Amino acid sequence: MDNASFSEPWPANASGPDPALSCSNASTLAPLPAPLAVAVPVVYAVICAVGLAGNSAVLYVLLRAPRMKTVTNLFILNLAIADELFTLVLPINIADFLLRQWPFGELMCKLIVAIDQYNTFSSLYFLTVMSADRYLVVLATAESRRVAGRTYSAARAVSLAVWGIVTLVVLPFAVFARLDDEQGRRQCVLVFPQPEAFWWRASRLYTLVLGFAIPVSTICVLYTTLLCRLHAMRLDSHAKALERAKKRVTFLVVAILAVCLLCWTPYHLSTVVALTTDLPQTPLVIAISYFITSLSYANSCLNPFLYAFLDASFRRNLRQLITCRAAA
């Protein structure tokens, strides 16, 4: 039986992304360096705690504050849901790491793998939708017109469509996720049919293309086209005023995109390395792999800080809701 394990020496988890720098789908349960064995669960725990607190605050504000019910904020709400879902299951990663074996059943294995893949794909998919929305809004503003059909209900339908697409994309991972005994320890792994090497490479390429290359290319095309079209336009005074009013929202979306790329680009670049080289499994390579995986996890807890620092209306509504709750 062929498998790609989520276990040591790569990031030890049932739900994490495929090991960042793994150059084969085999795994061993070699002892980890002591500093790494301590640092990894601590980092995961911090990401979990900060992510749960921050995303809970975002969900609370966006769901409770009437003035926050905008199209852009609806997409941000969906990002927060994906991040919250991932941080909720991150303790299972920690348990798997500390025990060095999968302590739960096969159904939970499939579920956790699927949730992690939701985290891998959903962020950039929703950011692609948000970038398309910004493209339409900024262009329409520059031309002193409204975007036809841009309503909260339409945004809800688009969000559901994105979740549906992501579900189809992550389904193969849930299908291949199984329990397997490796060196006497039960592990949550991806069990591939023969030929093993082909399926392993296909899974990495699948994630690279659908989870990074296509959405990032789409986003780059959207913003490049937008800048070119705006450069060729002359804005009247009314359009300039509207453009200034929309500038903060656009900046927030771009900031979220930048942080997402910062967190996920190393992971996807490591896929290219894994597909094209055969790295020795040295302590340094293992440590880098854990760092890259932790960086991708960190994306789930950073967005709330962007909203707090860059969105004055978010801060204001959060304070008002906290004040009202305290007064009650």
From Swiss-Prot:
Residues 62-72, 133-157, 225-248, 299-328 are cytoplasmic. Residues 1-37, 98-112, 178-202, 274-283 are extracellular. One of its GO terms (molecular function) is neuropeptide receptor activity. GO terms for cellular component: membrane; neuron projection; plasma membrane; synapse. It is a multi-pass membrane protein. The chain crosses the membrane at residues 38-61, 73-97, 113-132, 158-177, 203-224, 249-273, 284-298. PROSITE patterns: G_PROTEIN_RECEP_F1_1, G_PROTEIN_RECEP_F1_2. Found in cerebellum and frontal cortex. Detected at high levels in hippocampus, amygdala and trachea; at moderate levels in fetal brain, pituitary gland and prostate. Not in caudate, accumbens, kidney or liver. Also detected at high levels in lung carcinoma. One of its GO terms (biological process) is regulation of metabolic process. Pfam families: 7tm_1. It comes from the Eukaryota. Belongs to the G-protein coupled receptor 1 family. Interacts specifically with a number of opioid ligands. Receptor for neuropeptides B and W, which may be involved in neuroendocrine system regulation, food intake and the organization of other signals. Has a higher affinity for neuropeptide B. Glycans are attached at N3, N13, N25. It comes from Homo sapiens. Keywords: Cell membrane, Disulfide bond, G-protein coupled receptor, Glycoprotein, Membrane, Receptor, Transducer, Transmembrane, Transmembrane helix. Disulfide bonds join C109-C188. It is found in: Cell membrane. This is Neuropeptides B/W receptor type 1. Its main location: membrane.
